[in-house]
């Protein structure tokens, strides 16, 4: 089947990765709230560095690889199940596991309005990047557009977290999105050409923040 590099594919990606899509991503910070609480992220510049680091060598990079593999594997039940199990195992903390699995479950439920028989193998539960990748692959949106939409949505959610935590305003938050565009583009190109052999990360502070967050006394987010 040919890739749908057209308006329909674009509309679907914009819808699926929109803040209005009912997955509940607004309630998760991926450890960013803890980093803000510790004074590790205090400005728009800090936020940009945080996002770019995760994109290039953190869990966001791994999510991009998992999405790519799921996109390619959508018609191969055994391969798709394997990447789904791997994605769940890679969750580095209890809250990170909760976040990726609940987002993935909600995404699959909402994406049911765009049914495809090959998605039945996932059932109702899969990690978030696997759910997005499999659905995008089944509907042939194009891998690079799917990656770009997913990564941009991830950064957008981090900006929303930062605004609600009071470390940046809306204008500077949008500025972060503008300044991260080139990094997203580079990561899209890398991830589309990479494989699961390229999984890995070196963002220990972010991982520890995710672990510590569950003990944060007063918080706005679930992770």
UniProtKB/Swiss-Prot annotation:
Stretches that traverse the bilayer: none
Alphabetized UniProt keyword annotations: Chaperone, Cytoplasm, Nickel insertion
GO molecular function: nickel cation binding
Listed Pfam families: UreF
Keyword check for Acyltransferase: no
Location(s), subcellular: Cytoplasm
Any single GO CC term annotated in Swiss-Prot or TrEMBL for this entry: cytoplasm
SUBUNIT field: UreD, UreF and UreG form a complex that acts as a GTP-hydrolysis-dependent molecular chaperone, activating the urease apoprotein by helping to assemble the nickel containing metallocenter of UreC. The UreE protein probably delivers the nickel.
Function: Required for maturation of urease via the functional incorporation of the urease nickel metallocenter.
Family from the record: Belongs to the UreF family.
Protein name (Swiss-Prot/TrEMBL): Urease accessory protein UreF
Organism: Sinorhizobium medicae (strain WSM419)
Organismal lineage: Bacteria, Pseudomonadati, Pseudomonadota, Alphaproteobacteria, Hyphomicrobiales
